Amino acid sequence: METWRKGSFRNASFFKRITLGRPRRLHRQGSILSQASTAGGDHEEYSNREVIRELQGRPDGRRLPLWGDEHPRATLLAPPKPPRLYRESSSCPNILEPPASYTAGYSATLPSAISLTGPLHQCSEEALSDTPHFPRTPTPDLSDPFLSFKVDLGLSLLEEVLQILKEQFPSEPHF
């Protein structure tokens, strides 16, 4: 039971560490930064106030977001927009159409698809002439009484189909 209370959110010391530790940590960060700057080769001595002042406000007007800062996004300036490239401009290369030197160099080394189709069709025709032909399915006998089908078409489609059948088979009177 004791271990449960130690790591629980209900423990009062947990909230004290969160709320009361922030200002102290800020000062500790400033002292660590000042020690790191002297250890890194910059031989100037900085006090905690100077380091915090450098972190809060910089000469170019931008500010670094700090723990105690309420609106860190409002103080940061937006980065500059990149330049726009237009297709017609000379700064934008045309990547959709390859240059003439590229097409001339590669068209000479690679065969085209049209040049490959000739031998492909010749081989397939020779191979087909050697193989036996499969028997075709016989055409259905229209006078067979078991051959029947029904198609449900609308009136307009049915009239069009009958008109086409009359044009194709003018000698058949039963359409």
Swiss-Prot record:
It holds the Pfam family BORG_CEP. This is Uncharacterized protein C15orf62 homolog, mitochondrial. Residues 1-11 form a transit peptide. It comes from the Eukaryota. It comes from Mus musculus (Mouse). GO terms for cellular component: mitochondrion. It is found in: Mitochondrion. The gene is Gm14137. Residues 29-48 are annotated as: Disordered. Keywords: Mitochondrion, Transit peptide.
